[in-house]
């Protein structure tokens, strides 16, 4: 569905995107992550044909961006981070406008607008002006506008920013359903749990480069760091600490009062937990609580991009 090969973009002397490559199969859901200023928005703008790429090749649905951009755009629906709606028009009028912008006839746009309003759960508000809508409702119509021409590739740039939990849940379920019908999705967000819920594969961009790409399971197992076991115990003695520090697959043990944080190799936590229980029994120590924190997407992201704030 999408092929991006070594695409680059510079503004003046500053290179924003430094040769990114990736491809998507039809029906795949792809999460694109990165810190602020990493090059995510520029990348999706080039893919969608809104910003010309300086070099490299982009193909969408068999059409080459830069040569057959108009045909490629017919395959693409874009949900921008900003609300791209006219506030003084009704929800139905906004959808009709976007339908005609995509080349639908009046009849086609009217039929499709009714379908889209039902899809985003706003049929009853069709005749209300956008300026009367909540932030979450505007976001849902924003998505609806991108669906008017039945795109094969849906590009979503942080579509749940600043909305209520109910609207957020509705949007996520809508995206999931669209993907299950065969629509290809590129989804950018700073909410890691959304990407984990929606996406088959994940790409992480930093400083204009794709620094990691793969499934969540693959990336976390390779790059996500250690599994952490947190213990709260009734008491601690030196012999117990020596014993657990010498266990196979234990990389580090830190102690704070009666709490222990044990970093272990991710693939072996079941063996280590069994050994910990045995050592606690042998040293007459009662375990008050035990929690296992496996590598997750947020830890992976911070491991790769660092914890320094980005403007």
From Swiss-Prot:
PROSITE patterns, per the entry: ABC_TRANSPORTER_1, ABC_TRANSPORTER_2
InterPro entries in alphabetical order: AAA+_ATPase (IPR003593), ABC_transporter-like_ATP-bd (IPR003439), ABC_transporter-like_CS (IPR017871), P-loop_NTPase (IPR027417)
Factors inducing expression: Induced in response to linearmycins and other polyenes via the two-component regulatory system LnrJ/LnrK.
Keywords: ATP-binding, Nucleotide-binding, Translocase, Transport
Binding site for ATP: 34-41
EC code(s) of this entry: 7.6.2.-
MF (Gene Ontology): ATP binding; ATP hydrolysis activity
The protein's enzyme class: translocase
Domain ABC transporter span(s) in chain numbering: 2-232
Regions crossing the membrane: none
Role, per record: Required for resistance to linearmycins, a family of antibiotic-specialized metabolites produced by some streptomycetes. Part of the ABC transporter complex LnrLMN that probably facilitates linearmycin removal from the membrane. Responsible for energy coupling to the transport system. Also mediates KinC-dependent biofilm morphology.
Assembly, per entry: The complex is composed of two ATP-binding proteins (LnrL) and two transmembrane proteins (LnrM and LnrN).
Sequence similarity: Belongs to the ABC transporter superfamily.
Name this protein carries in UniProt: Linearmycin resistance ATP-binding protein LnrL
Taxonomic source organism: Bacillus subtilis (strain 168)
Source taxonomy: Bacteria, Bacillati, Bacillota, Bacilli, Bacillales
Gene name for this UniProt entry: lnrL
